């Protein structure tokens, strides 16, 4: 396995001083998937003060970035490396964070607390890949599986539910059945997680190649984090312009959209107003007049809850408000819309 030379140096310095050290988590997973390994986290048996002393003696800048959880950050040639002491977590509070952290000397204990088997591997050039939970096999078979008891993992940190969905979307992996069941059993715990953390995972999910399947299969989870979408799940569109119900249409437009987070978020929310304005004429044809304007206001409520940036808020709400307005496009209409809403929205 190839690691950035500075990561190798840090691991070697710790080994030379009698401590174990490994690259852990996502970088090991990505290497095995033959993907770029840009973000290397290091786990070690050395306590933070020992890590700091050893690396500073080698002329490396070290910052105390999370001492409570055993983390310091080393900076070499502009590259940042988080180095965390092996640990086991105490009881979790509110499905968010452990109340206590105990430092340990065994990499096995450290890996056992991690979320999914594909993220619970470690590596150094002396020992090779340490895989205690079948992560390599799950990578080979395209499976997302919780480490140990999935109910316990999700009760520890409910954001792991969104991480499972995100990995399934981005990697195209299937979520293992026991893990899937635990997701549905524990999805209400997402109400304990900050909206910003949920939005960060949702954005990554939307950018995945497998987003349509995940949004479909795990719609009940999406309904927990965006309850405004739930009326769309079974809202029929009986008219000549649609082959899916509202939610089916929504998720397929997400998949068809360019991989731009503003565009894909717009697609997720663009028809959210349809159930509120649905009417059916005497021929049994469904209509959704004013749904764009109504949907833009609902989307604003969703985005305020997620505390999105002003740029995302303005662009998404504007695109939703006007998404039904441009038909039979020609040069004159394009110029008119450029004048009305600005080039950034066209």
Regions found by a protein language model. Give the residues of each.
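Catalytic cores of the polymerase beta-like nucleotidyltransferase superfamily
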Residues: 1-346
């Amino acid at each position: 396995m190839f690691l950035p030379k500075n990561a190798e140096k840090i691991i070697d310095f710790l080994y030379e001083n009698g401590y174990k050290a490994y690259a852990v988590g996502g970088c090991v997973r990505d290497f095995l998937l033959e993907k770029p390994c840009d973000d290397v986290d290091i786990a070690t048996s050395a306590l933070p003060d020992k890590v700091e002393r050893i690396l500073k003696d080698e002329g490396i800048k070290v910052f105390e970035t999370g001492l409570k959880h055993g983390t310091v950050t080393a900076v070499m040639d502009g590259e940042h490396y988080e180095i965390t002491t092996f640990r086991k977590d105490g009881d979790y509070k509110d499905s968010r964070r452990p109340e206590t952290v105990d430092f340990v000397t065994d990499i096995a204990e450290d890996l056992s607390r991690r979320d999914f088997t594909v993220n619970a591997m470690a590596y150094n050039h002396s020992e090779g890949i340490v895989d205690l939970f079948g992560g390599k096999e799950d990578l080979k078979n395209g499976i997302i599986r919780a480490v140990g008891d999935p109910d316990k993992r999700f009760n520890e940190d409910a954001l792991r539910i969104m991480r499972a969905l995100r990995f399934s979307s981005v990697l195209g992996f299937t979520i293992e059945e026991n893990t899937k069941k635990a997701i549905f059993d524990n999805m209400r715990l997402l109400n304990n997680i900050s909206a910003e953390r949920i939005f960060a995972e949702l954005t990554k999910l939307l950018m995945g190649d497998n987003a349509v399947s995940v949004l479909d299969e795990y719609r009940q989870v999406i309904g927990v984090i965006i309850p405004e979408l739930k009326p769309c799940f079974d809202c029929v569109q009986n008219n000549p312009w649609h082959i899916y119900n509202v939610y089916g249409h929504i998720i397929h437009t997400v998949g068809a959209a360019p991989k731009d987070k503003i565009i894909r978020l717009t697609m997720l929310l663009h028809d959210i107003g349809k159930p509120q304005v649905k009417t059916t004429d005497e021929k049994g044809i469904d209509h959704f007049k004013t749904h764009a304007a109504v949907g833009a206001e609902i989307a604003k409520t969703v985005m305020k809850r997620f505390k999105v940036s002003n740029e995302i808020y303005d662009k998404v709400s504007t695109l939703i408000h006007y998404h039904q307005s441009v038909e039979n496009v020609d040069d004159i209409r394009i110029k008119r819309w450029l004048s009305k809403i600005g080039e950034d929205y066209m």
